[in-house]
Swiss-Prot record:
Location of N6-(pyridoxal phosphate)lysine modifications: 283
Name of the protein described by the UniProt record: Serine hydroxymethyltransferase
Outcome when changing residue 395 to R: In t1576; causes recessive maternal effect lethal (Mel) phenotype where homozygotes are viable but offspring display an embryonic lethal phenotype
Molecular function GO labels: glycine hydroxymethyltransferase activity; pyridoxal phosphate binding
Enzyme class: transferase
Gene name tied to this protein: mel-32
Amino acid sequence: MFARIVSRRAATGLFAGASSQCKMADRQVHTPLAKVQRHKYTNNENILVDHVEKVDPEVFDIMKNEKKRQRRGLELIASENFTSKAVMDALGSAMCNKYSEGYPGARYYGGNEFIDQMELLCQKRALEVFGLDPAKWGVNVQPLSGSPANFAVYTAIVGSNGRIMGLDLPDGGHLTHGFFTPARKVSATSEFFQSLPYKVDPTTGLIDYDKLEQNAMLFRPKAIIAGVSCYARHLDYERFRKIATKAGAYLMSDMAHISGLVAAGLIPSPFEYSDVVTTTTHKSLRGPRGALIFYRKGVRSTNAKGVDTLYDLEEKINSAVFPGLQGGPHNHTIAGIAVALRQCLSEDFVQYGEQVLKNAKTLAERMKKHGYALATGGTDNHLLLVDLRPIGVEGARAEHVLDLAHIACNKNTCPGDVSALRPGGIRLGTPALTSRGFQEQDFEKVGDFIHEGVQIAKKYNAEAGKTLKDFKSFTETNEPFKKDVADLAKRVEEFSTKFEIPGNETF
């Protein structure tokens, strides 16, 4: 009895203490944040319905300045594009208000009737654009971007600490294909999966498929990745398929850069030979910033006795995306992707793709005319890699000077580069300017501007210091350099502003 009384008293004291603590916590939660400065919105306006120019002039000015930068400059980053006004309308629609964890017909929230309709429509269009049979292919349209899409695939088909093989980053691959250095595991894909990169032939710059096959038979990866971020030639998907089958691996194709050209039917498609295909939606596909994962359905293989082995990718990949890596999808992005996919089905989109390829070849020839070496000698797609090592200019220095002259590109490693931190070239792409209406004769002029910028970098290279930091400091203070760049920038702006940019007029 005494024990029970003590126990009750102890419990009473415990609850009393807990109650006291809760009251203290409650008081703390409601204590005003003394250091937060708040502003009062004007009485005659509505913060929820007014234009961003009124609600937040500071943000509006930044957006407006970015629009001006895009308009006055030459956008040559191969992974960028200008999406349409219709896609932007979808991104700014009421679809951004809804939470919808799960998949159509199986959501964790109510009120998803039209969200389901939009996601199913997006899936339908994604399959139509690439000519895929819904009985043989499925697609997940929820990945937030390309990197998590690739990670979801590895999670689904490779598993923790499983083995993957992708093209090495310095040779034209992507971070998400398993990149690491001797010093550290740079990408999470090399942290959670075992990665063995394959390489290009340092002489030709072309993928060494024989060496890839040899290493795949030794390494026995669960997935081989046929994908690039800076490789100007077509991939041999049939050869990839044979190697993957021989090694007992899935073939995953990452067509993020080239999916728009595949959609237009202008370059080889990975679908005939792949088990899984991923893509972003904002590069040559010209949509919003999102991603798609396509996966095989039906029969994977048949043994000598006629027994079929079926694909089981649908549930694995969908589960890896949600709930594995993501929560609620971005429904406004899915709406924007659906709009972009409808545009892919137009004749106008095919004409755009054809012009992208013509412009890339024109730019390649113009750069060669100016004496520059190109990795692989040219291009079959939307990009080219200019090797600046023969003229003694690092890619980062060329990128910096071109940026000052309103020409946006990116430094990039070239085959044979010793360090990814000091790349020897610059990558150039044609989709963005093609979307602005640039044609072959315009890209000849673009090539001339690039040449001028690189020559300015070369002219001042020796006196500008040994490090990139020294070089940038020099460009901020040296008056002859600043005069040369200002002259080029003025002519670039005069040329570029003749062309319109899709989207909203001012921001």
